[in-house]
Amino acid sequence: MDTTVAPTGGRHGTNHRLPTGHWRTVVRGTGQLFVTAGLVILLFVVYELWWTGFTTKRDQHQLITTLRHEWAHGVTIADPPLGSGIAILRIPRFGPKYAFVIVQGTSTADLIKGPGHYPGTAMPGQVGNFAVAGHRTTYLHPFYSINRLRSGDPIVLETRTRWLTYTVENIPGTTARYSEIVSPSDIAVAYAVPDQSDPSLAGTQRILTFTSCNPRYSAAQRIVVHALLTDSAPKSAGLPKALAGYQLKGA
């Protein structure tokens, strides 16, 4: 009886299989890479969504404290320095807790603190276009839900002496719709007469314009919202109609 066992390793009887220990090392190394990558991504998300929000919240607290102090002492700065607070923004559609100090400037350093006013555009309540940029997904994401704004929605600004109520709507006499999606290079949305080709045209209306990145987590486009000033009242007269029932705290 022939008890010869055929070789198992190929034509020449050589076994080419790698040692089990080698595969374990490969699998372990790959697993460690995935774990490390996952931790890096997690830390990035924590930084983007939590830490940036923490720093902005701290900055907002400092801004409102300074602004309230200046207002209490009758201080109005005609040409506010970059990064300083100029007005308090409230949007009823976003709820009674929504409040942000708008800062002067739109640089990275400015927008870390909160929504920023484009220098060179009108100031709150003035004739022209008070244009404001803001983040949608980081630094407390003040414009996260900007896409939810609808025609007829009120937007309220608080200055030292007045309540300014703007109403989201198409801008008469222009092609500017109340909500638009444009390219990042389309700066005409912030002109005194928005969406016109001539930046030197003098404005005749009191406009508010918001700009932010679109879609969320992308800078491929800009989402724009326009509004018109529809009411201006002294703060001594009490809260404006749009804020009826509000109990204002902090900002």
Segments predicted by a language model, with ranges:
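Extracytoplasmic/periplasmic soluble domains downstream of a signal peptide or transmembrane helix
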Residues: 130, 137-251
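Structured, soluble extracytoplasmic/luminal domains of envelope-associated proteins
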Residues: 96-148
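Glycine-centered tight beta-turn/hairpin loop motif at sheet-sheet or coil-to-beta transitions
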Residues: 94-97, 161
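N-terminal membrane-targeting segments
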Residues: 1-63
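Short extracytoplasmic/periplasmic juxtamembrane "stem" segments immediately C-terminal to an N-terminal membrane anchor
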Residues: 58-76
